[in-house]
Every structure is written in C-alpha cells, then in structure tokens.
Amino acid sequence: MQVNETLAEGLRHEFQISIPAAEITAKADARLVDLKDKVKLDGFRPGKVPVSHLKKMYGRSVMIETIEDTIRDTNMQIATDRGFKLAGNPKVTMPSEVKEIEDILAGKSDLSYSVAIEVVPAIELADFKTFSLEKPVVDVSDADVDEAIKRIADQNRSYSARAEGAKAENGDRVTISFKGTIDGELFEAGSSDDVLVVLGSNALIPGFEEQLVGIGAGETRVVKTSFPSNYMENDLAGKDAEFETKASLIEAPQDIKIDDEFAKLLGLEELDQLKQVVREQLSAEFARAMRQHLKRALLDRLDDTHKFDAPPSLVEEEFEQVWKTVTTEMETNKKTFADENTTEEAARVEYRQIADRRVRLSLVLSDIGEKNGIKVTDDEINRAVISRARQTPGREKEIWSYYQKNPQALAQVRAPLFENKVVDFILELATVTEKKVTREDLFKDHEAHSTEA
C-alpha cells in the first residue's frame, strides 16, 4: 500500500492512496470462503457450496463491501499513525471513469483514491487552578415565600358577580367581547368573544385594561390603543387600533385568607407546611440560576484562555443549525433583520462567531474529559431518560423505547450530563468566591445570559 500526503494546510490534510489489486482480491476471496459456511443454496449441502459458484453469485457485492471496508480502515489507520483526531468523516474521491471503477471491481486494477481529512487541533489546556470565579448567592427570604404564596392565592382566587349597575374597578374580572380595527378595517385575530380579563393584570396590550375601568355589564366602549413596537406579530407592531368592546359580566375578587384552611385546599396539612414546600421550590429555582450564572462565567473564562482555529467544517455545521433556528423564529414571528436593527450580513457574522465559540468550547470540554477520565455511565443516562419520560405521564414506555432505539437521541441526553461533569471537575480546581446579590440582579443576569451562546 502506498500513501502519499498531497496537502497539509492548517487543519486540512489530503492523501493519495493506492492499494494493490491482489490485496483487495485476497480479502474478498477470504470473505467468500467465510460465506461458504453460512449460505444455504438449493442443491448443495451446508458448507459444500464451491467458492467459484459463490463468486459468480455474490462476487461483485462482496468486492464492493471489501473495498468500502478497506477504504474506511485505511483512512482510520492513516489518522491513527499520524496522531490525528478527526473533526468529521473523511471525504473520499474515487476515480471518475466508469472503466477504472469496473477494473477495480474486477480485481484488474489497484484501488486508487484520494481522501481529504480535517483534524481537531492539539489543545493546550489552561491551568484551572489559576481560575478565579464569582458565584452570585441569594438566600430565600420570608418575603420571597410570602410573595410566592400570595401569587398562588391570586391564581386560586374566586370571583362573584357585582350588583346590577356596578362599575368595574381595578382588580375586578371582566368578561368582554371585542372587535378590533386598524384604519377602519377588521384585522386577523383582532376579534374575540367571552374573554376573561382581570383589570390591572396587564394581560392585554398596554392601555387596553385601563380604559375598561368604570365599564358596566352590558356597556360598550371603544378602546383606542397601539400595539407595542416589539409586538410578536410584525404586521401589527406599532400600529394604532380601535377595539369595540362590550362587557357582559363584572365580577369582584373574593377575599382569600392565607391560613391552614388555604393550605388544605392545596392538599397540605397546614400553612407552615405550605411555606416549607414553597421555600424548597424557591431554593431550587435560585440554585439553578446561581449555577447557570457560575457556569456562564466559567465558559467565558475557558473561551478567553483557549483561542485556536476550530475545524471549519464543524463551525459551518454549527452555524447552519444556529442560522436555521434564527431564521425560523424570525419567520414565525414575522420579523425582519431591520426590525432587529441589523442586516442579514451583520447577523451572519455575529452568529458565525457564536458558532465558532460553541465549537471551540465543545472541543475544550471534550479534551478535558478525555484527559481526565471523565465519563457518563449507562446508569446515569438511563436515569436521565427516565426523568424525561416521567414528564409526560402515560407515555413513559413509548418515550423510553424511543431513546433506546435512537442512538442520536441518547447522545443528546449524554451531552449535557458530560458537560456538567466536566464543569464540576473544573470548579473543584478553581477558586470560587461567593457574592451576595439581590434576587432581581440574579434573575436579570440569568435572563440576559440565557439569550447568548
């Protein structure tokens, strides 16, 4: 076998390979001999089918399989011998002439082909003991618990009809029907009947609910307002509209006492138990946000300390996925790049940078895991699948079966488990200091970071 490197440019390498026809033929013949003991043909006893007969029947297909396997094995051997870590599947170019291909299949010509390989660069990992990271810390206060319970109470609040002739007040629930027009013309999704709205809840577009204060049952008003400039329906964003609105029922909120009886309505024994449950839920919510903030800071540090050229094919693949998501969301929301104060060209540059960052961080995390023996066990993956299955009661077996039959789906389960294990490994080595912040600051930062790569 002859292997000649014809290109070594950055992360791209190309080779010209030639494998003697005799070697390929010998491998194919060995397969036919092995096939002799497995195949069953009428007129022949098991294991007694002549190889020459098998060659007439299966010779071409066996030769094709042999060539495919030889090319795959040769490519992997080339990478192994040179210490290459492949960034993707090698790209093989076979002879273009039909006669050349037929001669190779007939064993008359050597197997000659070229292959292009893109490799992952060697990564020099930073000393994680030098990392200094800040973790925001927020304690769950009694006020947080009380506020959360009040929200629960508001969600479970009952309403009763006001007396005849009563006017709607802020906090009342009003049943309305409306027809919306823009420039005197009805518009799609601008009309609805029997809509329940609590005045002051800001459930409707700005300015709508305020104009319903003082309305009575059976009364009709024309509500004049404007759609926000960032409204999700681009066709309506920023436009003035009028809604002919009729109220059919005015209901006043009933007082609700937060006590042991209220807790029992929720299936708990007493108010203290409700407070404990809510505190635990808030603690878990805060912990997730704090963890995400710390993880983001760590990924930023890894990004800053590991600058290298990522394999272009991986960056392109990641960019295509990101771009597809972005453009699909824009089409769904009927947005344009101009609406986002940018151009398509500028957006492509921005999202390609995001794709490059993601690929580099993925390679860094993978390298850290490989060099430090970090693995995700089958048991950990199974527990994660079970957790996902339990989120859709009644379909647990179906979801379990789906993951067991789809290696790609299982890989998507494994990826975040592996990433979090590597993150934990680095955090054990880094210096992490805690900083007290307000709940508002924690979730403000958390929301901002959730929109970034």
UniProtKB/Swiss-Prot annotation:
Gene3D superfamilies: 3.10.50.40, Trigger factor ribosome-binding domain (3.30.70.1050), Trigger factor, C-terminal domain (1.10.3120.10). It holds the Pfam family FKBP_C. It is an enzyme of class 5 (isomerase). Residues 171-256 form the PPIase FKBP-type domain. InterPro entries: PPIase_dom_sf, PPIase_FKBP_dom, Trig_fac, Trigger_fac_C, Trigger_fac_C_sf, Trigger_fac_ribosome-bd_bac, Trigger_fac_ribosome-bd_sf, Trigger_fact/SurA_dom_sf. GO terms for biological process: 'de novo' cotranslational protein folding; cell division; chaperone-mediated protein folding; protein transport; protein unfolding. It comes from the Bacteria. GO terms for molecular function: peptidyl-prolyl cis-trans isomerase activity; protein folding chaperone; ribosome binding. It catalyses: [protein]-peptidylproline (omega=180) = [protein]-peptidylproline (omega=0). NCBIfam families: tig (TIGR00115). Belongs to the FKBP-type PPIase family. Tig subfamily. PANTHER family: TRIGGER FACTOR CHAPERONE AND PEPTIDYL-PROLYL CIS/TRANS ISOMERASE, TRIGGER FACTOR-LIKE PROTEIN TIG, CHLOROPLASTIC. Consists of 3 domains; the N-terminus binds the ribosome, the middle domain has PPIase activity, while the C-terminus has intrinsic chaperone activity on its own. This is Trigger factor. The gene is tig.
